[in-house]
């Protein structure tokens, strides 16, 4: 399972991240530039400047504003980056990319959201989340996604809930118990997944 480090929105954080890991970043616009920033109305580093330090395995692009995708794709092409996927897009923007032939997007399934969306959307990734802490749904969902050749990326529990250590152990137990094939996990705590 590939470990994706969550919210690596600065060159300093990128430098601290082993090159064997993937990274997730947040993208917004400022004037006519794409910046890395999770929260609105803040100043972040320029995406193109950040990419001059990129030499990692997988790039997960969390789009915080609709309509950035075309510009982001131009920048990725300029830097020769092809191992990526888009995350947290609205369904219409996700479908627009898919209709243009780019399936490097993630549709979400969770304990509250049906797996049918990722299965029928044309997305090549599924972002697997839990809003209640109930991860048992993975036992039926993951095999269906695997059979459909849709890559899977878990949202590690600490991204949703601060007190997550016992939940993390339960989640890891479910994965092991059921022999689930998960392709990646996005986490603030890579050491918990090694």
What kind of feature is each model-predicted range?
Residues 1-194:
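Phosphate-group recognition and catalysis centered on beta-loop-alpha active-site segments
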């Amino acid at each position: 399972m590939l470990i994706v480090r969550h919210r690596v929105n600065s060159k300093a954080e990128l430098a601290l991240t082993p090159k064997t890991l993937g990274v997730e970043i947040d993208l917004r616009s400022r004037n006519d530039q794409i910046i890395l920033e999770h929260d609105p109305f803040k100043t972040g580093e320029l995406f193109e400047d950040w990419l001059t330090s990129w030499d990692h395995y997988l790039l997960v692009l969390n789009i915080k504003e609709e309509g950035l995708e075309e510009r982001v794709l131009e920048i990725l092409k300029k830097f020769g980056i092809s191992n990526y996927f888009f995350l947290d897009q609205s369904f219409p923007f996700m479908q627009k990319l898919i209709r243009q032939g780019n399936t490097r997007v993630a549709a979400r399934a969770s304990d509250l959201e049906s797996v049918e969306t990722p299965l029928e959307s044309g997305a090549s990734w599924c972002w697997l989340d839990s809003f209640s802490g109930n991860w048992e749904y993975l036992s039926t969902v993951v095999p269906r996604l695997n059979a459909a050749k849709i890559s899977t990326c878990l949202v590690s529990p600490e991204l949703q809930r601060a007190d997550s250590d016992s939940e993390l152990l339960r989640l890891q137990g479910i994965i092991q118990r059921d022999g689930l094939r998960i392709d990646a996990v996005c986490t603030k705590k890579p050491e918990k997944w090694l």
